[in-house]
Amino acid sequence: MSDDGEQPGPGDGAARDELSGMDLVRRTLAEARAAARARGQDPGRGFAAGPAPRRVAGRRRSWSGPGPDTRDPQPLGKLTRDLAKKRGWSGHVAEGTVLGQWSRVVGAQIADHATPTALNEGVLSVTAESTAWATQLRIMQSQLLAKIAAAVGNGVVTSLKITGPASPSWRKGPRHIAGRGPRDTYG
């Protein structure tokens, strides 16, 4: 209150100085509610209003039962597979499976001697550790394609490009000139 007997208004800064603790909080809350009403909003009453009324109309809640239900927890693998299918990522995921899980797709023995290097437009490039393994993989090409199709689906890998190890190079340094051609290097 001020000295001349007037009541302080809601915007009066002197009234706030006189109030303390919970009185100040109540006054501030009342001002905020009044401002909300002035803007045409419903200020609400928070927890003082009591619990929200229960829904009477609509479907009653029922338990799942012993059989499978859409509300049952789903395996993470199934959820990610469905997400990839919805977003159109299935092709990219299949390509990543071929390159990332090569040993599981083709088997441990083949994976020990051959490495996938690239997958472009259905052509899988595979580098073998020796020319003998490259020849063996070329012979087994149809079986490899069948294993890959069984693991990731048909159409992901349509053909294989199998290469042996890179041949040795005797070039040294960044610049070179054409030499005399291939010679009998080894004797």
From Swiss-Prot:
It comes from the Bacteria. Residues 1-77, 166-187 are annotated as: Disordered. This is UPF0232 protein MMAR_0004. Residues 14-30 have a biased composition (Basic and acidic residues). Residues 31-55 have a biased composition (Low complexity). InterPro entries: DciA-like, UPF0232_actinobac. It holds the Pfam family DciA. Belongs to the UPF0232 family.
